[in-house]
Amino acid sequence: MIAQIRGKLILKTVSMVIIDNHGIGYEVMIPLSTYYELPDVGSEVSLFVYTFFKQDSILLVGFCTENEKQLFKLMISVSGIGPRLAVNVLSGINSSELIHAIANNDLNRLLKVPGLGRKMAQRVILELRDKVSGWTSKEQITFINNKKDAIDQSVMEEDAISALINLGYKSQAAKDAIDRVISEGGENKSLDVILKKALKVLAM
């Protein structure tokens, strides 16, 4: 089982990366929180990896921190939640909010995460509430810091909208959120910053 990958980052998107390790390119699914922490393409990168075996393939899911990997493992322990939905959840809400929502029975906050219906959100709280009670989120979860340069504005806006749609938000809702962020001073900001602000808007 692959638990960690270290190598050259040869491709990155908001949902996956390809890492070259000794001439072999590994495609790794990632949540947005990991995307925010990635270095530039061509740089060395190391990710903690969860290996998911399917009938005809292997799915690798990568994280910048071991703590986030453990949170991912908690999510997929919930009946009905697979790796893709778990990644989607970790992309739609930061680790601190997720732990707080589960520990405090905040169903309304979980319902704002795309892909989590009422029954699934209730199941997450029911099955994980006791398990996260010992987590001190501010101390144990590594948070994201924006370190990326701004990119072309129009391309950035399109990429941001596309990323939100891929997370499960409706096209118009994604566009409205991005437009609001831009109108409130988001011009010339990096994709990372725009996405984080847009997710906060969508969570309101």
Curated annotation (Swiss-Prot):
One of its GO terms (molecular function) is four-way junction helicase activity. SUPFAM superfamilies: DNA helicase RuvA subunit, C-terminal domain, Nucleic acid-binding proteins, RuvA domain 2-like. It is found in: Cytoplasm. Residues 65-143 are annotated as: Domain II. Pfam families: HHH_5, RuvA_C, RuvA_N. InterPro entries: DNA_helicase_Holl-junc_RuvA_I, Hlx-hairpin-Hlx_DNA-bd_motif, NA-bd_OB-fold, RuvA, RuvA_2-like, RuvA_C, RuvA_C_sf. Keywords: Cytoplasm, DNA damage, DNA recombination, DNA repair, DNA-binding. Its main location: cytoplasm. Residues 1-64 are annotated as: Domain I. One of its GO terms (biological process) is DNA repair. Residues 144-154 are annotated as: Flexible linker. Residues 154-204 are annotated as: Domain III. One of its GO terms (cellular component) is cytoplasm. It comes from the Bacteria. The RuvA-RuvB-RuvC complex processes Holliday junction (HJ) DNA during genetic recombination and DNA repair, while the RuvA-RuvB complex plays an important role in the rescue of blocked DNA replication forks via replication fork reversal (RFR). RuvA specifically binds to HJ cruciform DNA, conferring on it an open structure. The RuvB hexamer acts as an ATP-dependent pump, pulling dsDNA into and through the RuvAB complex. HJ branch migration allows RuvC to scan DNA until it finds its consensus sequence, where it cleaves and resolves the cruciform DNA. NCBIfam families: ruvA. Homotetramer. Forms an RuvA(8)-RuvB(12)-Holliday junction (HJ) complex. HJ DNA is sandwiched between 2 RuvA tetramers; dsDNA enters through RuvA and exits via RuvB. An RuvB hexamer assembles on each DNA strand where it exits the tetramer. Each RuvB hexamer is contacted by two RuvA subunits (via domain III) on 2 adjacent RuvB subunits; this complex drives branch migration. In the full resolvosome a probable DNA-RuvA(4)-RuvB(12)-RuvC(2) complex forms which resolves the HJ. Has three domains with a flexible linker between the domains II and III and assumes an 'L' shape. Domain III is highly mobile and contacts RuvB. Belongs to the RuvA family. This is Holliday junction branch migration complex subunit RuvA. It comes from Syntrophus aciditrophicus (strain SB).
